[in-house]
Structures are given as C-alpha cells and as structure tokens.
Amino acid sequence: MPLIAISYSHGKLSILNQLFLPHQTTYDPIYSACDAWHAIHDMRVRGAPAIAIVAALSLAVELYDLIQKGKLSDQAKEVEIFIREKLEYIASSRPTAVNLVEAAGRLGKIVVARSCGEGVTGREVAEEYIRAAEKMLEDDVKDNRGIGEFGAKWIMKQAIDGAEGKGKVAVLTHCNTGSLATAGYGTALGVIRSLHAANSLKHAYCTETRPYNQGSRLTAYELVHDNIPATLITDSMAAALLAHKSAGVGAIVVGADRVAANGDTANKIGTYGLAVLAKHHGVKFLVAAPRTTIDMNTKSGEGIAIEERPRQEMTRIRGPRVGGEQDGLGAMETITVAADGIDVWNPAFDVTPASLIDGIITEIGVVEKDRDGEFHLERVFE
C-alpha cells in the first residue's frame, strides 16, 4: 500500500501530521488557506514540493466551499484579488522554499489572465484556479518519478563502476525527500526507490538530521514502509561511513529547498557538510529537485534567505514514553536535552556551493557542469 501524505479529492484535503510520526498516524483536515499556513509553519507538513501542493490545494478547497455555499463574489476582479492576497499570505509561512513562492506566482498569473476575459464571472475565475491547483498535484507525482528514473540511471552509470557490491551501490541521503515531502514518490528518496526497483541498490543510509530529526522520524519510516534495506546513522557518523570502504557508498543524494541560477543549493542544515565530505572521499554528490525548485532570479546562494527556527526545536525533543518490554510505547512527552540558559543558533538550512555538486537531477534529466566548470541551468527551461 503506497504511503499517502496528502489526501485530496475535489473539495476535500487532509494531510498526514508529520509531527506525530513515526509513532502515530493522524490526518489533519485542511479547510482553508489559514489552516494551510499554520500546518506549513508548524511543520505538520514539510518538504518544498509538498508545502507548495498543500498551499495550492488549501485555497482550492476554500474556494470550492465558497462556491457551494453561494458566498463567492460574482465579480471576476474581486475573486482575482481575493486569490492573490491568499496566495501571498500562504507564501509567507516558509520563506526559504522557492516552490511555495513559485507556485503562488504561477497560480496568481493564471487567475489574472482568466479574470481579464470579457464577461468572465467570479466563479469561472475560481474554477480556473481549482483546475490549475489540481494539475499541480498530478504533475508533481509524474515529475518525481522522472527524477527517480533519471537519477538512478545516472548513478548506475557514474557511481556503480567505482563501488563495491557487484553492480550495486549504497546511497546516503539527508533529511526527508520522499512521499512525505512531495505529492508522492519523492525526489532524492525517489532516486533510492528507483535504484531499489532496478535491483541496483546495495543499501540506503539515512542521517538522523538534527535538530528536527526528519531522517530518523520520516525517512526511516518510509524506508521501513517500503522494505528497502536501510540503516540510520547520526549526522556526525557520515565521515566514518564514507571512510568505511566495505559500506560501498558511491553517492550522496539530497533534495533542495532552493537552487540558485549558478547551482548553489539551499537545503536542510547539514547538507553543506555532507558535500564537503563527499568531495574529500571521492563520492558523487547529487541534488534531486524539480525545475520548480530552481530560482533563476537568484544568481547565487548569497541571495537566498535562510529561515531560522525556534530555539526549542534544538533544546527539546518529543516522543512517546518507553515502558517495560511488555508495555510498549506510552503517552507523548516533551523533554529538554540542553543546559538551561545556553544560547542557541538554529538555522533550518545551509547553502552548498555549486562547486561541490556533481549533478542536479530534474524531471527532464541530470544537469552536469559544462567544460567551464559551471552549471547552465537556464537550459532546463528551454
């Protein structure tokens, strides 16, 4: 049974609350753009592609409800303004993720174009928006499978030759980039899924991904769900793993929240360190991201705003109480793991320089550096 993180049917949306994973499966209904803003900001849903999809669909659900109740304005311009204001509001929930901003901009242009038509009603503008949002959901799953296939083929060609394991490769990934971070299948984790399906995966390794533990809570959950051979490591074990030749790690594959025009990549904190380790150990380092994550308006990583999260996300940890062997898991509790009064710096992302990246996997192929040693990402939009 496939893992479903975003459940949508016309007029209804619910999300798998990722704050409770892996111990509890709870779906939260989303009725409005306001609901989506809080779900995204609180990280009940996360992952750049997923939050863009949830943002888009939340407004589709809100518009559908207004239509059904007869509360939507008949004036096309009024509905256009309503939609654009809601999109701007949702986009403020997670500023680093370019997919969210890109989706808001793209959907805004669609409703502006529709509202300019002669004799167009407010309902027709809303229905045009709903169709566009639903198509985003459909396209995301298709794009993720493309990323998985292209990435797996590249790794099989480029990385397996130098890895031990008789035609198979071990892959290390960071944070969560699977079905829980997208509309389905995943980006970097989609590459691992495709390698596994092709019988070319020796083993998958996932980092714990402190301080929010997306690796141990979410990626490990997906790997176990899909019966993919995998091992969890702490973030600080990555160097030792790459030095351990018998592990056969031939590639590190990560996702992205924003890729600048020159290839500099903002991703979960700790990604930059993994790229440095990969370069030192001669391991391929790949970024897996749809074209919607590439921001051609941002020239380099210096122009990417880095979100900082609350100190409590580093100094506290939440999970179920562990009882005796027969008792299983108890009630959820929050405990502190840091000295009271210590200062905290908690950036959610870091920026990996393009010079450390071997390839950027998109839904239309893998982009490598040209002879000049630079990525020319404008070509993926031609």
From Swiss-Prot:
| GO BP | L-methionine salvage from methylthioadenosine
Which InterPro entries does the record match to this protein?
IF-2B-related (IPR000649), IF-M1Pi (IPR005251), IF_2B-like_C (IPR042529), Initiation_fac_2B_a/b/d (IPR011559), M1Pi_N (IPR027363), NagB/RpiA_transferase-like (IPR037171)
The protein's role, per its UniProt record: Catalyzes the interconversion of methylthioribose-1-phosphate (MTR-1-P) into methylthioribulose-1-phosphate (MTRu-1-P).
Q: What is this protein called?
A: Methylthioribose-1-phosphate isomerase
Name a GO CC annotation attached to this entry: nucleus
Tell me yes or no: is Metal-binding among this UniProt entry's keywords. Answer: no
Pfam families, alphabetized: IF-2B (PF01008)
Arranged from A to Z, the UniProt key words for this protein are:
Amino-acid biosynthesis, Cytoplasm, Isomerase, Methionine biosynthesis, Nucleus
What's the domain of life for this entry?
Eukaryota
- Annotated site location: Transition state stabilizer: 175
Q: In which pathway does it act?
A: Amino-acid biosynthesis; L-methionine biosynthesis via salvage pathway; L-methionine from S-methyl-5-thio-alpha-D-ribose 1-phosphate: step 1/6
Where primarily located? cytoplasm
Family as reported in the entry's similarity comment: Belongs to the eIF-2B alpha/beta/delta subunits family. MtnA subfamily.
Keyword Amino-acid biosynthesis in record: yes
The active site is formed by 257
